[in-house]
Protein backbone atom coordinates (compact mmCIF):
# COMPACT_ATOMS: atom_id res chain seq x y z
CA UNK A 1 0.00 0.00 0.00
CA UNK A 2 2.80 2.41 0.89
CA UNK A 3 4.68 1.57 -2.33
CA UNK A 4 1.53 2.22 -4.38
CA UNK A 5 1.04 5.55 -2.63
CA UNK A 6 4.61 6.59 -3.47
CA UNK A 7 4.26 5.56 -7.10
CA UNK A 8 0.94 7.37 -7.51
CA UNK A 9 2.29 10.58 -6.01
CA UNK A 10 5.71 10.81 -7.68
CA UNK A 11 4.43 13.14 -10.40
CA UNK A 12 2.72 15.37 -7.86
CA UNK A 13 5.86 15.37 -5.77
CA UNK A 14 8.07 16.50 -8.62
CA UNK A 15 5.92 19.59 -9.12
CA UNK A 16 6.80 20.62 -5.58
CA UNK A 17 10.23 19.04 -5.26
CA UNK A 18 12.03 19.33 -8.56
CA UNK A 19 13.64 22.29 -10.25
CA UNK A 20 12.84 20.95 -13.70
CA UNK A 21 11.67 17.82 -15.46
CA UNK A 22 12.98 16.40 -18.71
CA UNK A 23 10.48 14.68 -20.99
CA UNK A 24 12.05 12.26 -23.45
CA UNK A 25 11.21 12.27 -27.14
CA UNK A 26 11.40 9.27 -29.44
CA UNK A 27 10.69 9.18 -33.16
CA UNK A 28 9.41 5.99 -34.71
CA UNK A 29 9.26 4.85 -38.31
CA UNK A 30 5.44 4.91 -38.31
CA UNK A 31 5.44 8.60 -37.47
CA UNK A 32 4.53 8.32 -33.79
CA UNK A 33 6.39 10.96 -31.85
CA UNK A 34 6.73 11.81 -28.18
CA UNK A 35 8.07 15.27 -27.50
CA UNK A 36 11.09 15.78 -25.25
CA UNK A 37 11.49 19.13 -23.57
CA UNK A 38 12.53 20.81 -20.35
CA UNK A 39 9.76 22.43 -18.36
CA UNK A 40 10.35 24.72 -15.41
CA UNK A 41 8.54 23.45 -12.33
CA UNK A 42 7.09 25.16 -9.26
CA UNK A 43 9.53 24.50 -6.41
CA UNK A 44 7.90 26.79 -3.88
CA UNK A 45 6.98 23.89 -1.58
CA UNK A 46 10.57 22.76 -0.91
CA UNK A 47 13.00 25.18 -2.57
CA UNK A 48 14.84 22.30 -4.24
CA UNK A 49 17.19 23.09 -7.13
CA UNK A 50 19.23 20.88 -9.45
CA UNK A 51 22.12 19.36 -7.52
CA UNK A 52 25.70 19.10 -8.71
CA UNK A 53 28.10 16.52 -7.30
CA UNK A 54 29.21 18.68 -4.37
CA UNK A 55 26.08 20.56 -3.25
CA UNK A 56 23.44 17.89 -2.70
CA UNK A 57 22.55 19.06 0.81
CA UNK A 58 22.27 22.72 -0.19
CA UNK A 59 20.27 21.96 -3.35
CA UNK A 60 18.04 19.11 -2.20
CA UNK A 61 18.03 19.26 1.59
CA UNK A 62 18.58 16.26 3.86
CA UNK A 63 16.74 13.49 5.66
CA UNK A 64 17.78 13.33 9.30
CA UNK A 65 16.26 11.69 12.38
CA UNK A 66 13.23 10.57 10.38
CA UNK A 67 12.49 14.07 9.04
CA UNK A 68 13.06 15.76 5.70
CA UNK A 69 14.67 19.20 6.00
CA UNK A 70 13.97 21.05 2.74
CA UNK A 71 16.30 23.78 1.40
CA UNK A 72 13.67 26.47 2.05
CA UNK A 73 13.60 25.62 5.76
CA UNK A 74 10.41 23.58 5.81
CA UNK A 75 10.42 20.32 7.76
CA UNK A 76 8.41 17.30 6.61
CA UNK A 77 7.89 14.65 9.28
CA UNK A 78 5.75 12.29 7.19
CA UNK A 79 4.00 11.96 3.87
CA UNK A 80 5.09 11.29 0.30
CA UNK A 81 7.39 14.32 0.12
CA UNK A 82 9.63 12.91 2.82
CA UNK A 83 9.54 9.41 1.30
CA UNK A 84 10.45 10.49 -2.21
CA UNK A 85 13.05 12.93 -0.90
CA UNK A 86 14.74 9.99 0.84
CA UNK A 87 14.84 8.05 -2.44
CA UNK A 88 16.08 10.99 -4.51
CA UNK A 89 18.75 12.11 -2.07
CA UNK A 90 19.89 8.53 -1.56
CA UNK A 91 20.38 8.15 -5.32
CA UNK A 92 22.66 11.18 -5.64
CA UNK A 93 25.97 9.40 -4.88
CA UNK A 94 25.32 7.08 -7.83
CA UNK A 95 24.69 10.13 -10.01
CA UNK A 96 27.86 11.93 -8.97
CA UNK A 97 29.69 11.14 -12.21
CA UNK A 98 27.13 12.90 -14.41
CA UNK A 99 26.94 15.85 -12.01
CA UNK A 100 30.54 16.84 -12.75
CA UNK A 101 31.02 20.39 -14.03
CA UNK A 102 32.65 20.01 -17.45
CA UNK A 103 32.33 23.52 -18.89
CA UNK A 104 31.12 27.06 -18.39
CA UNK A 105 28.73 28.81 -20.76
CA UNK A 106 28.59 32.59 -20.94
CA UNK A 107 24.92 32.55 -21.89
CA UNK A 108 21.78 30.47 -21.97
CA UNK A 109 21.59 29.03 -25.48
CA UNK A 110 18.51 27.47 -27.04
CA UNK A 111 18.04 25.54 -30.26
CA UNK A 112 15.37 26.61 -32.73
CA UNK A 113 14.75 27.21 -36.43
CA UNK A 114 15.78 28.82 -38.65
CA UNK A 115 18.99 29.28 -36.65
CA UNK A 116 20.14 29.72 -33.08
CA UNK A 117 23.36 30.16 -31.16
CA UNK A 118 23.33 26.57 -29.90
CA UNK A 119 22.65 24.99 -33.29
CA UNK A 120 25.22 27.22 -35.01
CA UNK A 121 27.82 26.28 -32.38
CA UNK A 122 27.00 22.60 -32.81
CA UNK A 123 27.17 22.37 -36.60
CA UNK A 124 30.27 24.55 -36.88
CA UNK A 125 31.95 22.22 -34.40
CA UNK A 126 30.97 19.19 -36.49
CA UNK A 127 32.40 20.83 -39.62
CA UNK A 128 35.70 21.54 -37.88
CA UNK A 129 36.01 18.08 -36.34
CA UNK A 130 35.01 16.24 -39.52
CA UNK A 131 37.73 18.07 -41.41
CA UNK A 132 40.21 17.27 -38.65
CA UNK A 133 39.28 13.56 -38.58
CA UNK A 134 39.24 13.02 -42.36
CA UNK A 135 41.95 15.44 -43.44
CA UNK A 136 39.54 16.72 -46.07
CA UNK A 137 38.05 20.12 -46.75
CA UNK A 138 34.54 20.33 -45.34
CA UNK A 139 32.54 23.18 -46.83
CA UNK A 140 29.03 22.54 -45.56
CA UNK A 141 27.34 20.93 -42.58
CA UNK A 142 23.80 19.64 -42.08
CA UNK A 143 22.15 18.39 -38.91
CA UNK A 144 18.62 18.26 -37.51
CA UNK A 145 17.21 20.36 -34.70
CA UNK A 146 15.70 17.18 -33.26
CA UNK A 147 19.21 15.93 -32.50
CA UNK A 148 19.72 18.71 -29.95
CA UNK A 149 17.47 17.69 -27.09
CA UNK A 150 17.93 20.27 -24.33
CA UNK A 151 19.22 23.81 -23.93
CA UNK A 152 22.70 24.95 -22.93
CA UNK A 153 22.46 26.50 -19.46
CA UNK A 154 24.17 29.75 -18.56
CA UNK A 155 27.00 29.29 -16.07
CA UNK A 156 28.25 25.87 -14.99
CA UNK A 157 27.56 23.10 -17.50
CA UNK A 158 27.27 19.58 -16.10
CA UNK A 159 28.21 16.36 -17.84
CA UNK A 160 24.52 15.51 -17.54
CA UNK A 161 23.67 18.62 -19.58
CA UNK A 162 25.92 17.59 -22.46
CA UNK A 163 24.79 13.95 -22.38
CA UNK A 164 21.15 15.04 -22.37
CA UNK A 165 21.79 17.54 -25.16
CA UNK A 166 23.16 14.90 -27.55
CA UNK A 167 21.79 11.52 -26.38
CA UNK A 168 21.39 9.76 -29.71
CA UNK A 169 23.83 7.31 -31.26
CA UNK A 170 24.28 9.40 -34.38
CA UNK A 171 27.60 8.99 -36.18
CA UNK A 172 29.51 11.76 -37.90
CA UNK A 173 29.71 11.40 -41.69
CA UNK A 174 31.69 12.87 -44.56
CA UNK A 175 30.22 13.16 -48.04
CA UNK A 176 31.05 14.71 -51.37
CA UNK A 177 28.09 16.30 -53.13
CA UNK A 178 27.70 18.40 -56.23
CA UNK A 179 26.30 21.86 -55.73
CA UNK A 180 23.03 21.00 -57.44
CA UNK A 181 22.36 18.27 -54.85
CA UNK A 182 23.13 20.68 -52.02
CA UNK A 183 20.68 23.09 -53.64
CA UNK A 184 17.98 20.41 -53.53
CA UNK A 185 18.59 19.89 -49.81
CA UNK A 186 18.46 23.62 -49.10
CA UNK A 187 15.28 24.03 -51.16
CA UNK A 188 13.68 21.21 -49.16
CA UNK A 189 14.56 23.03 -45.95
CA UNK A 190 13.25 26.34 -47.29
CA UNK A 191 9.91 24.78 -48.18
CA UNK A 192 9.45 22.23 -45.37
CA UNK A 193 11.28 23.82 -42.44
CA UNK A 194 14.87 24.81 -41.78
CA UNK A 195 17.25 22.41 -40.13
CA UNK A 196 20.75 23.07 -38.79
CA UNK A 197 23.17 24.36 -41.44
CA UNK A 198 26.76 25.51 -41.40
CA UNK A 199 29.24 26.81 -43.96
CA UNK A 200 26.45 28.17 -46.13
CA UNK A 201 24.48 31.40 -46.08
CA UNK A 202 20.95 31.24 -47.44
CA UNK A 203 18.20 33.64 -48.33
CA UNK A 204 14.67 32.28 -48.70
CA UNK A 205 11.27 33.88 -49.03
CA UNK A 206 8.23 33.31 -46.85
CA UNK A 207 6.63 31.25 -49.62
CA UNK A 208 9.32 28.60 -49.13
CA UNK A 209 11.54 29.36 -52.11
CA UNK A 210 15.32 29.34 -51.88
CA UNK A 211 16.37 32.73 -53.25
CA UNK A 212 20.15 32.39 -52.97
CA UNK A 213 22.90 30.36 -51.33
CA UNK A 214 26.58 31.10 -50.80
CA UNK A 215 29.38 28.79 -49.70
CA UNK A 216 32.69 30.31 -48.73
CA UNK A 217 31.46 33.72 -49.83
CA UNK A 218 30.76 32.51 -53.37
CA UNK A 219 27.42 31.64 -54.99
CA UNK A 220 26.59 27.94 -54.79
CA UNK A 221 27.98 26.32 -57.96
CA UNK A 222 25.76 23.49 -59.23
CA UNK A 223 28.70 21.70 -60.89
CA UNK A 224 31.27 22.08 -58.12
CA UNK A 225 31.96 19.20 -55.72
CA UNK A 226 31.73 20.20 -52.06
CA UNK A 227 32.79 18.45 -48.89
CA UNK A 228 29.83 17.93 -46.58
CA UNK A 229 29.41 16.68 -43.03
CA UNK A 230 26.21 15.40 -41.47
CA UNK A 231 24.99 12.62 -39.17
CA UNK A 232 24.07 9.15 -40.36
CA UNK A 233 20.44 9.65 -39.28
CA UNK A 234 19.98 12.09 -42.17
CA UNK A 235 21.70 10.02 -44.85
CA UNK A 236 18.65 8.15 -46.07
CA UNK A 237 15.28 9.15 -44.70
CA UNK A 238 15.73 10.62 -41.22
CA UNK A 239 13.37 13.59 -40.77
CA UNK A 240 12.54 13.19 -44.46
CA UNK A 241 16.05 13.95 -45.71
CA UNK A 242 18.19 11.83 -48.05
CA UNK A 243 21.49 13.68 -47.91
CA UNK A 244 23.50 10.76 -49.31
CA UNK A 245 21.40 10.61 -52.47
CA UNK A 246 23.69 11.15 -55.48
CA UNK A 247 26.74 11.46 -53.20
CA UNK A 248 30.09 10.89 -54.93
CA UNK A 249 31.62 9.66 -51.68
CA UNK A 250 30.13 8.65 -48.31
CA UNK A 251 32.17 7.89 -45.21
CA UNK A 252 30.50 7.01 -41.91
CA UNK A 253 33.12 7.80 -39.30
CA UNK A 254 33.62 5.80 -36.14
CA UNK A 255 32.63 8.78 -34.00
CA UNK A 256 29.31 9.43 -32.34
CA UNK A 257 28.25 13.05 -31.98
CA UNK A 258 28.80 12.94 -28.21
CA UNK A 259 32.36 11.68 -28.84
CA UNK A 260 33.00 14.89 -30.75
CA UNK A 261 31.19 17.38 -28.52
CA UNK A 262 32.25 16.19 -25.07
CA UNK A 263 36.04 16.19 -25.64
CA UNK A 264 35.70 19.63 -27.21
CA UNK A 265 33.94 21.20 -24.22
CA UNK A 266 36.40 19.55 -21.85
CA UNK A 267 39.31 20.95 -23.87
CA UNK A 268 37.79 24.43 -23.66
CA UNK A 269 37.66 24.10 -19.89
CA UNK A 270 41.25 22.86 -19.75
CA UNK A 271 42.29 25.96 -21.70
CA UNK A 272 40.30 28.24 -19.41
CA UNK A 273 37.84 29.11 -22.18
CA UNK A 274 34.04 29.23 -21.91
CA UNK A 275 31.40 28.04 -24.33
CA UNK A 276 30.13 31.10 -26.16
CA UNK A 277 28.53 31.65 -29.55
CA UNK A 278 26.23 34.01 -31.41
CA UNK A 279 24.03 33.70 -34.45
CA UNK A 280 25.54 35.14 -37.62
CA UNK A 281 22.55 35.45 -39.93
CA UNK A 282 23.29 32.36 -42.01
CA UNK A 283 19.57 31.98 -42.74
CA UNK A 284 17.64 35.06 -43.83
CA UNK A 285 13.92 35.04 -44.57
CA UNK A 286 12.63 37.82 -46.83
CA UNK A 287 9.16 38.75 -48.06
Predicted regions and their residues:
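Bacterial N-terminal signal peptides
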Residues: 16-24
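Membrane-targeting and insertion segments and their boundary/processing signals
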Residues: 92-100, 109, 155-156, 160, ...
Amino acid sequence: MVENEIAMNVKRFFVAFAALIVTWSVSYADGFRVEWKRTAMDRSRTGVTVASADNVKEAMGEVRCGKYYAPNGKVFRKGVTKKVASVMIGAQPKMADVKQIVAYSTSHMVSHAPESALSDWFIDLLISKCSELTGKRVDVGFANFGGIRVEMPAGDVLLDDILSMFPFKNKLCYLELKGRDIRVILQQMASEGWQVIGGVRCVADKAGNLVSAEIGGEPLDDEKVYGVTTVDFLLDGGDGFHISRNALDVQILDKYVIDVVLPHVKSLTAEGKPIEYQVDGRVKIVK
